[in-house]
């Protein structure tokens, strides 16, 4: 450039004004980056800069601005992109022919130097994207591992890996998987394709050394084959790290390790594993990325990552290796399955199939005794934990005696203990809720819980002799929740309980027989999983079952109320009016078979989850922010692609 005061040489062109530098924000559904480019920059040049940040080939990038796809030859000024505006980025999937999978055996066995970060040229060759991707391998496409950055579908697979070790064992034993995992170079390249791992290796070279060591990769794959060994190794390592704090200088080593290695690694996969188990409650609301590590001595012990967050410390006592907590099972299904509680109940019946038969025998004996003609003065007392049957002197079955406090008894048919009423009385055990359910045992039919909460659902006696002063109550009666003389006849729940149980006894007997058959149990689980998929993918088809359910409910609800066999011939004088509200159609629905009622719950209890608009609300907002304003077209595209925003954008482009 000519200095000030000097004339330009003759024949030289006139000075051209420098292009204006602008700042463009590139936003993806999960990330956002800022780029400083000139306004004359073409879209192709911008894609090349974006590909270096997002580790993707420029041909995979699609830039969207104001609802339009930006073309490569156009400049930013021609597209109307000005300083401070946002351009949306969509990374397309990798589509290649199956013939590119053949050179898998030609992967070099020696990787880069330890700690070195592979260059973009080594990750993306000149002829296209990487030659290896799980999305191209036959048999693994259903696992969803072709998505970049491990989206939500593999996260559910990882949660199953933690909670169901048998699933991983079956997956590893598949003949195709060992051949895939035996190629350590392929596994290393698959891991390096993750942008989070790229950034982690850049800041921590020792992780790159681990990935470049084939022996460590082989040992890791062997641990995957044996989940018990892997869990024991992790527990032993945690004990060593906990003892490291007591060694002089060990606290500084722990601070460095957790700040520089553990926290970035766990935060990188936080969406997949549900959070950082090493983060304490005091640091949940703090920003760990900007805060400096404290140089003070740690006075608090490190948190135990193996402690369950759903229950107390005593919930893990006596737990075996193959056991699972009920909240862990419920987290793998949508919220409406938490209302039905069918999977939990089938799981418990599978673990102890004899419990249902024992309970049904005690229930059948109690019902047969209740149908006998009662005495003229006193009502027949219900079965209670006593050694003899009142009035007959015959010993009661041990099953019916212990059924009140048995944890394996179905919760929707169990009587509550006296501590649930808030007053004195014998306690059958801890962990009972207000309706007498065990807190870790779900209901089979949720409708019975509503009817059980209307009245004190306990084996109460309504003997008129108990209200006469000077006459003591029989010893087998429990402590009353309130004076028996004030208790109306209409509050006796025994007749209603009989009407509810008797139509379901044949079904429960068949259910017990099915629990002993592994194939039948697997079929029941497949039915539930099919209903889950149907409620998500085709909610309107599930609504089609409503006329059938309504007809079944009306037939079951039309059962005439019979006379109470437990009622005395001489009722109490001047009984107060009944306090029951009128039974509506929803409450009469529990008289229908449980599996039909499960379908009814899917439609009626939480209809918002069955609406596609509510299910894809977040994805619809993302598409609207990208400029796609046709909500109906966006919804149809999301339904067709299963909620994948990138695939929905491609479908909208083609339409």
Curated annotation (Swiss-Prot):
Residues 22-98 form the Ubiquitin-like domain. Residues 318-330 have a biased composition (Basic and acidic residues). Testis specific. CDD domains: UBA_PLICs, Ubl_PLICs. Residues 110-122, 279-290, 377-395 have a biased composition (Low complexity). PANTHER family: UBIQUILIN, UBIQUILIN-3. Residues 102-124, 277-330, 364-399, 412-447 are annotated as: Disordered. This is Ubiquilin-3. The gene is UBQLN3. Residues 432-441 have a biased composition (Polar residues). One of its GO terms (biological process) is cellular response to stress. Residues 194-233 form the STI1 domain. Residues 609-655 form the UBA domain. GO terms for cellular component: cytosol. It holds the Pfam family ubiquitin. Transmembrane segments: none annotated. GO terms for molecular function: polyubiquitin modification-dependent protein binding. It comes from the Eukaryota. PROSITE patterns: UBA, UBIQUITIN_2.
């Amino acid at each position: 450039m000519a200095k000030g005061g000097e004339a330009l040489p003759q024949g030289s062109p006139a000075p051209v004004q420098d292009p204006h530098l602008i700042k463009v924000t590139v936003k993806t559904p999960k990330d956002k980056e800022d780029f400083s480019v000139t306004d004359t920059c073409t879209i192709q040049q911008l894609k090349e800069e974006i590909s270096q940040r997002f580790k993707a080939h420029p041909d995979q990038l699609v830039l969207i601005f104001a609802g339009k796809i930006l073309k490569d030859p156009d400049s930013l000024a021609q597209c109307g992109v000005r300083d401070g505006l946002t351009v949306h980025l969509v990374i397309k999937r990798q589509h290649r022919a199956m013939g590119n999978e053949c050179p898998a055996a030609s992967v070099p066995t020696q990787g880069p130097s330890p700690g070195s970060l592979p260059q973009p040229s080594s990750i993306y060759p000149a002829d296209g994207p990487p030659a290896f991707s799980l999305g191209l391998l036959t048999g693994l496409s259903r696992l969803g591992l072709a998505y970049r950055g491990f989206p939500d579908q593999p996260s559910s697979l990882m949660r199953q890996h933690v909670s169901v070790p048998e699933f991983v064992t079956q997956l590893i034993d598949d003949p195709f998987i060992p051949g895939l995992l035996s190629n350590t170079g392929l596994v290393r390249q698959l891991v390096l394709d993750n942008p989070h791992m790229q950034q982690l290796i850049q800041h921590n070279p020792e992780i790159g050394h681990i990935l470049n060591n084939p022996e460590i990769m082989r040992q890791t794959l062997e641990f995957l084959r044996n989940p018990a060994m892997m869990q024991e190794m992790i527990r032993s390592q945690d004990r060593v790290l906990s003892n490291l704090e007591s060694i002089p200088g060990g606290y500084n080593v722990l601070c460095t390790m957790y700040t520089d290695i553990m926290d970035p690694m766990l935060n990188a996969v936080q969406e997949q594993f549900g959070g950082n188990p090493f983060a304490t409650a005091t640091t949940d609301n703090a920003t760990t990325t900007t805060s400096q590590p404290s140089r003070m001595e740690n006075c608090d012990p490190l948190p135990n990552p193996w402690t369950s967050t759903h229950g107390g410390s005593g919930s893990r006592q006596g737990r075996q290796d193959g056991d699972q907590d009920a909240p862990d099972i419920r987290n793998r299904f949508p919220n409406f399955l938490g209302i039905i509680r069918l999977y939990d109940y089938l799981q418990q019946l599978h673990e102890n199939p004899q419990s249902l038969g024992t309970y049904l025998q005690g229930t059948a004996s109690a019902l047969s005794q209740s149908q006998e003609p009662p005495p003229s003065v006193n009502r027949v007392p219900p079965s209670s934990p006593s050694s003899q049957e009142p009035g007959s002197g015959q010993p009661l079955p041990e099953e019916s005696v212990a059924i009140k406090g048995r944890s394996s008894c179905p919760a929707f048919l169990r009587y509550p203990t006296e501590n649930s009423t808030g007053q004195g009385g014998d306690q059958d055990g801890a962990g009972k809720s207000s309706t007498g359910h065990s807190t870790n045992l779900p209901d089979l039919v949720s409708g019975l819980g509503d009817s059980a909460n209307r009245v004190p659902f306990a084996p109460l006696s309504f003997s008129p002799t108990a209200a006469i002063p000077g006459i003591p109550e029989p010893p087998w009666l429990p402590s009353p929740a309130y004076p028996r003389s004030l208790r109306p006849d209409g509050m006796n729940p025994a007749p209603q309980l009989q009407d509810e149980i008797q139509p379901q006894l044949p079904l429960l007997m068949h259910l017990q027989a099915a629990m002993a058959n592994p194939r039948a149990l697997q079929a029941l689980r497949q039915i539930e999983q099919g209903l889950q998929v149907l409620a998500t993918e085709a909610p309107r088809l599930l609504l089609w079952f409503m006329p059938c359910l309504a007809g079944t409910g009306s037939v079951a609800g039309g059962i005439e109320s019979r006379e109470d066999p437990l009622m005395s011939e001489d009722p109490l004088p001047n009984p107060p009016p009944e306090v029951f509200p009128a039974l509506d159609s929803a409450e009469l629905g529990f008289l229908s078979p449980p599996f039909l009622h499960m379908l009814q719950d899917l439609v009626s209890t939480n209809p918002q989850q069955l609406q596609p608009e509510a299910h894809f609300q977040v994805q619809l907002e993302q598409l609207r922010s990208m400029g796609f304003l046709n909500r109906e077209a966006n919804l149809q595209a999301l339904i067709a692609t299963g909620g994948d925003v990138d695939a929905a954008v491609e479908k909208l482009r083609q339409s």
